Amino acid sequence: MKIINILFCLFLLLLNSCNSNDNDTLKNNAQQTKSRGKRDLTQKEATPEKPKSKEELLREKLSEDQKTHLDWLKEALGNDGEFDKFLGYDESKIKSALNHIKSELDKCTGDNSEQQKSTFKQTVQGFFSGGNIDNFANNAVSNCNNGGS
């Protein structure tokens, strides 16, 4: 019976010593929880920023005239995915195409300028439905002239 009492006392002492360490463990867990919360906040703050579209990235690199003609081209190509395909081309080729559009539209003056611009828009639509941007300046030409008709 004495042995059982001694073992029981040793067991209680051992159990008591484990509880004293648990207080430190609880403090550490609380600190870890706080630091984990801070880490989660920094991750949440970083995620709301959504990536920019190809069009937005391109617009940052264009002049005001080029942006205007990009809008014109977007309207001309419509929602058939041709505009998205256009945005996939090299930036220098896109700028060259936009400058070509500007020069062709600037030629459209006079009484029939709106009709000439509409015809050029149809020409551009037809070109991008099957053409490659490399030949754009040669194949997408307006019937406009400087004098108008």
From Swiss-Prot:
Lipoprotein found in the keyword field: yes
Signal peptide span: 1-17
Lipid-binding residues (covalent, N-palmitoyl cysteine): C18
GO cellular component: cell outer membrane
Lipid-acceptor residues (S-diacylglycerol cysteine): C18
Domain of life: Bacteria
Main location: membrane
Compartments where located: Cell outer membrane
Region (Disordered): 26-58
Entry keyword set: Cell outer membrane, Lipoprotein, Membrane, Palmitate, Plasmid, Signal
Function, as annotated: An outer membrane protein that may participate in pathogenesis. Some human Lyme disease patients have antibodies against this protein. The Mlp proteins probably undergo intragenic recombination, generating new alleles.
Protein name: Lipoprotein MlpF
Organism in which the protein naturally occurs: Borreliella burgdorferi (strain ATCC 35210 / DSM 4680 / CIP 102532 / B31) (Borrelia burgdorferi)
